[in-house]
Each structure stands twice: as C-alpha cells, then as structure tokens.
Regions:
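Short, hydrophobic/aromatic-rich segments at coil-to-beta transitions
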Residues: 57-62, 114-116
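Hydrophobic/aromatic beta-strand patches that form the interior of the parallel beta-sheet core
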Residues: 44, 78, 238-240
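Active-site catalytic microenvironments for nucleophilic, acid-base chemistry
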Residues: 35, 80, 91, 257, ...
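Active-site substrate-recognition segment that forms the wall
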Residues: 76, 80-235
Length: 296
C-alpha cells in the first residue's frame, strides 16, 4: 500500500494487489484491544449511546443513553461510528455525511476451497473463497455493491444479481472464479445463498473526516465567502468518519493522526496538504455550497 500524490494536493489512495489478502475484523479489533492492556483504557460494551453533548460545566463531553443517563464523561470525545454519527451529533452540525449501502452475497464455502489456500479476487467487489464468521462457520462471499444515499439494511435480490455479474466477469479469466460461479448458481438453486447489507459512510468529496469537529452553534454565521479558517471548532470534540470502503486500511493510520492532534503534537504522520484535505472544517462549507448549487 502507498500514498499517491497529484499536482494539487495529496490524496489518500491505496494500491490494491490483484490477489488480495483476508483479515478478520473482529480478530484485528481484539488484537488492538490486547495491545492496550495496561493502559488507562476502560472498555464498555452492551450500552447504547444516544447522543454526545457538552457537560453542564461545558468543559467536558458526555455520552448519554436514551434515558438521559450519562454513560461516560471526559475532556475529549471522539465520534467514530460511521454514518450513525448523524444521530449522536447535534442536528445542526452539518458534515455532509452520506450513507452508502452495500450488499454482500455469500454461502457455505466449497470444502475444496477450505482445504487449500486460495487468494481473494477483485472486480467491482471482492470474491473471498473462504473465511470463518464469528459463529465459526466457513463461508465464501462476493461483494459488495454500492448505493449512495441508501441506509436501509434490507437485502435486494437485484444486488445478488449484480454480485453474480461481477463474479462472472472474474470467471472469464480465472478458473478459480469459474468454480465459484458454479457454486453460486448451485446454492442459489438450493436456497443456500444468503445476503448481508452493510452501510458505509462517505463525505461529499469522498475523503475522510479526521480532526476537531466544527462548533455547531457557529455554523449559522457562515457565508459563501467563508474560509475553513473561519469555521470555529468545538473544544474537545473530535471525529474520525467517512472512511468509505477503506476503513480497515485507513483507521489505524488516521487513528494515530487523530491521537497526535488531540495531544497537540506538531509532528505529523501526514503531509500538511493532506491533513488539510481531511480537516472536518471543510465539511460545513461543502454542505452550504452544495445546497447553493442545487438551488440554481
């Protein structure tokens, strides 16, 4: 993987290998949590945060549940729950987040594929020949599709058809994909084929949002001539959002970048123009200008 540059500014981009590799997200998260053992991290699970809001003294932030009880309170809050951030943040904090639904088609893995290592393949999605789910079930998968502006988790048979078409395209040059296509059709006929929908989070310019979040109360004062330096930020409130389909790749890097920003570290892992490109303060200006264009 590498960063690519263009003449105007740095761009977050990844070079994909033709044959990819598989990582279990849950195993990766567990490894990160294990690495934090001995730190001051307190993991709280089984709680639903309904909103993030200033504490009464306005010097801290509170994570509040649906019954208005404070779950946690701290000097710094980081919102990093993808498109669901729209329900945590104030309604008038306009970041221009967009849902991008994607459907994966999957079924029981071919026993032959589980007995030997086969690479993942890419074409308008990824074909993964075999991996274990959290239920210790071994499956294959193909996907996912893209539907910008859609947040519904309901599967659509047309997306299964789209995933089959992508797999069929792979099959024109890959015997492995041809076998997978045969398995796809067999399981579709037997009723073993299944679908799963996830919702990505994207920004207006499709770049991540990483850093100090804008002060919602100051957004009403912005005008067409406002610059990002005119956008006030909410002290202690940060965000890591809009990672799109690259969250697994970008989250570790941008997590380090965000930690440095919170600590006020002047050294950075990214060049200044790239930091500016992912600055959350750009978001309300983009939302305002997009609305102006739509009115014309």
């Amino acid at each position: 993987r590498s960063f690519q540059m263009n003449n105007s500014h740095s761009a977050l981009a990844l070079e994909h290998e033709e044959h990819g590799h598989l990582v279990s997200p849950s195993a990766l998260v567990q490894a990160w949590l294990q690495a934090c053992k001995g730190s001051q991290l307190t993991l709280m699970t089984g709680r639903t945060v309904s909103s993030v809001r200033p504490a009464v003294d306005a010097h801290q932030w509170c994570a509040v549940d649906q019954d208005n009880h404070i779950i946690a309170q701290a000097d710094v809050a980081v919102v990093c729950n993808a498109f669901a951030a729209t329900r945590l943040l104030p309604a008038h904090m306009t970041l221009g987040l967009t849902a991008v639904a994607g459907q994966m088609t999957y079924g029981p893995a071919d026993p032959h594929a589980t007995s030997c290592k086969q690479p993942a393949l890419r074409h308008k999605g990824v074909y993964a020949p075999n991996f274990q789910t959290n239920r210790t079930e071994t499956i294959w998968s193909m996907g996912a599709t893209y539907h910008r502006g859609i947040s519904s988790p309901t599967p659509d048979p047309r997306d299964d058809d789209a995933n089959r078409a992508s797999l069929a395209q792979l099959a024109t040059s890959s015997p492995q994909a041809m076998s997978a296509l045969t398995l796809f059709d067999k399981q579709a006929a037997s009723g073993e084929l299944r679908s799963w929908v996830g919702v990505r989070c994207a920004s207006i310019d499709r770049l991540p949002i990483c850093g100090s979040l804008p002060d919602a109360s100051s957004m009403a004062t912005l005008t067409d001539s406002s610059k990002r330096d005119n956008v006030a930020t909410a002290p202690g409130l940060f965000g890591l959002l809009a990672l799109g389909s690259r969250g697994l790749s970008l989250a570790p890097l941008l997590g380090e970048v965000l930690a440095a920003q919170i600590d006020g570290d002047t050294a950075t892992l990214l060049p200044p123009d790239l930091l500016r490109a992912i600055d959350p303060r750009r978001a309300p200006l983009q939302v305002m200008r997009q609305a102006r264009r739509q009115q014309c």
